[in-house]
A protein has these predicted regions:
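Hydrophobic/aromatic-rich alpha-helical bundle segments in the mid-to-C-terminal region
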Residues: 138, 155-202, 216-219
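Basic, helix-initiating cap at the start of DNA-binding domains
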Residues: 1-54, 71
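Amphipathic alpha-helical packing segments from all-alpha helical-bundle domains
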Residues: 124, 131-156, 166-170
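Residue-level preference for short helical/loop micro-motifs built around acidic side chains
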Residues: 41-42, 67-68, 76
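Hydrophobic alpha-helical connector segments
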Residues: 72, 79-123
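N-terminal intrinsically disordered/low-complexity leader segments
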Residues: 1-22, 208-238
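Short hydrophobic/aromatic patch on the recognition helix
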Residues: 54-63
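Hydrophobic/aromatic residues within well-ordered alpha-helical segments
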Residues: 23, 77, 98, 102, ...
């Protein structure tokens, strides 16, 4: 978005996209806290608005329902994984890359980011019994699958929308969903976060390798990376 567009929006009483995201995330934080403390059924839109310091009308301008208020904080809970997958260099194995990024995360994560991660874990736990929150979690998992498709396509030299890539991405994303739920449950049950963190990185790498039949996980030599074939022709041959 250009500065001119942002300025025009503001002059007309509008809101920049960056500001809109910040407001939605703040609403989501307070909604998640209330959902965890008193349940989804026990929480109203008016209570969420009061907790954030906004009008109820403003809440409904940003969200279609009170349950959908959880979506930004749930999506935030997988953002580190998505960022790590996006930045995975061809010359590194998945294990090496996750180990490097995990060390950086520990040194750079802010208190607010830690708090958001904790709220995300709690919403994922609530999603086990709250269908509307389950929708928010599955939406986040769908985004992981889409990002995985792009990563896998790059490493295999295939098209992101090809059948083989989509199958690999779907299987790997399902495995990552289970790992996230397992790790989150462990954290809420009091398991040492350091132990779970080390386990989860190993689980993720192993899950991606297993889900893709070993096709993804190893380093890729740039000068040996395969060129993208005509996948339609390959599918027809099969």
């Amino acid at each position: 978005m250009t500065d001119d567009v942002v300025t025009t929006q503001r002059s007309r009483g509008g809101m920049s996209e960056q500001r809109r995201r910040r407001v939605r995330l703040e609403i989501s934080r307070e909604a998640a806290r209330l959902f965890w403390a008193q349940g989804v059924d026990g929480t109203s839109g008016d209570q969420i608005a009061e907790a954030v310091g906004l009008s109820t009308r403003t809440i409904w301008r940003h969200f279609r329902s009170k349950e959908s208020c959880a979506e930004p904080i749930v999506a935030q809970s997988v953002e580190w994984e998505l960022a790590t997958l996006r930045s995975w260099p061809l010359h590194r194995s998945l294990e090496e890359h996750f180990a490097t990024e995990a060390k950086r995360l520990v040194s750079e994560i802010s208190p607010s980011e830690q708090a958001d991660a904790g709220l995300g874990v709690k919403m994922i736990r609530l999603a086990e019994t709250e269908p509307a929150l389950r929708t928010a979690w599955l939406m986040a998992c769908d985004q992981v699958e889409r990002e995985l498709a792009a990563v896998i396509a790059t490493r295999l030299g295939l098209k992101p929308d090809g059948l083989q890539v989509r199958l690999h991405a779907a299987a790997a994303a399902a495995a990552l969903r289970v790992i996230n739920e397992y790790v989150g449950a462990g954290l809420l049950d009091g398991t040492d976060p350091r132990k779970l963190g080390d386990e989860s990185f190993a689980f993720i790498a192993d899950a991606v390798r297993t889900a893709t039949g070993g096709a993804v996980g190893d380093p890729v030599q740039v000068d040996e990376a395969p060129a993208a074939p005509d996948e339609g022709a390959a599918d027809r041959q099969e």
